[in-house]
Amino acid sequence: GTSGLRRLSSAELGASLRALFGVEASDLLVDVPEAGSTRVPFDNDFTAQAVSTSLVQALSTFADAYAARVVADARRPVEALAGCRPSGPGDRACFEAVVRAVGRRLLRRALAVDEVTRYAGLLSYAAEEQRFDSAVELLIAALVQHPEHLYRLETGAPSAADPGLLELDQASIATRLALLVTGVLPDTRLLEAAEAGRLADPSVRRAEAARLWATPEARAHWARFHAMWLGYQGLELPPTLSAELSRETQQLYDRVLFHEDRRWLDIFALDESYLSPALAAHYGLPAPAAAAWVPARGGGVLSHGTFLVQGAKFGDTSPTLRGARLFERVLCGHLGPPPVDVDTDNPPPGGPSACKTERYAMRQIPACAGCHIVTDDLGFGLENLGVTGQWRDAEAGRPACTIDGRGRALAQIFTGPRELGQVLSRAPEVERCATRQLFRYVVGRPEAPADQATLDALAAQLATTPRFREVVLALAASPALVHRVR
């Protein structure tokens, strides 16, 4: 399918700069407008990216602020990158080394002689201010907002086998590979492989992907993917609770995807949770002496507060919202808007003592039944878990309204998060949806009819080898990574 001109997302930009210089950037990126897609849950949909005056100004402001932060860092990361220490403000040889080193990493190619000469002209500012770092700061600011840094400019030659395809050049392959596995731009070792022309070899790409898989950047990258996929990116909770919940879920992904290389969909089925004493107390579970993996309620992330809090409405849980999130994100179902005469801004009708099973009766309305039979059957199965995951046997404030935790998913009756997770983690429908969401994230756009063969191949790959790491490494070695539609 189509490969468009993709701009780095704020997360990719910040993570790439942090990996290169060791200097944090995320707090400076908060004012950079992010593309908001209504068709996929991810922040890298290039079909929603647009250039505006406000974006250009925000990126310029960011580049200036970040460059100042880098040169102020006592560790002198730029000098370490260039391998030289300036003898004075006019040290041209050292500054040209800085230009070549920083330019190569940010633009993913060697700078031409005339480019190095042009950027070396910035030394006049260093001489004027008697400060070598004045030129370095201007250089970093210029390169950070350079189009070749901010955009994935994929170039190549027409394919001899298929004139409709381009065979990507080595630098473009390196960029694709690095962003696929880690969400950051290529490191020095990957650029060296590209410069040696070795990335056309699938076995080399797979080996490089396996190396990158072991980095902290890869773990953070795929945690972000899952957070956006399942909808809990940016929790609006008290900071301490948010940190505890986020750590629990991060530990789940680290264990399933990285440490134990388990089945990908075990994220919905793991029976243990990583709990601190404080989080165990919050959930109403026996507290370990220190943070540890302990038996919990099952269902993997389905019983985590990170996921559950999304289903809060009207001061309590909403079976409809929870079920809708599962149906749309985990089963890739589509829900249309409610009828225009339905009031969604007020709680479902019913007396003060009415139980939810009575009040959530929209399935009895013909115009609403099609959606609510699906969403409410899913959501009621998680009702034993409160807004942020506390166990309860009855509805809040209604002790007579006991909760049995029964629900229905994919025509199967289940009780509670453990049984729901067992259903979802083994369902072909979830395998297909998971690979669809992965495709959307990797290619940076919604799927199109022309992508069906690729989607089928991804789903078949997961069905055959259900480990997430293997799916990613297979993508890295695949012909699709080194080609694009002309």
Locate each region found by the language model.
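A conserved hydrophobic secondary-structure block that centers on an alpha-helix together
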Residues: P86-L139, A160
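Sequence context surrounding c-type heme c attachment/ligation sites in exported
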Residues: A280, V294-E431, V442, P449, ...
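Short, functional "switch" segments adjacent to catalytic/cofactor/reactive centers
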Residues: A35, V40, D45-R100, L385-T435
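C-type cytochrome heme c attachment motif
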Residues: A15, A19, M228, Q364-I373, ...
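Periplasmic c-type cytochrome electron-transfer domains
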Residues: G1-A68, A72-D73, E79-G83, A101-R109, ...
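Short, solvent-exposed loop/turn and secondary-structure capping segments
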Residues: A19, L28-V32, E115, L150-G156, ...
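A cross-family structural signal marking well-folded subdomains
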Residues: T47, V144, A174, L180-V181, ...
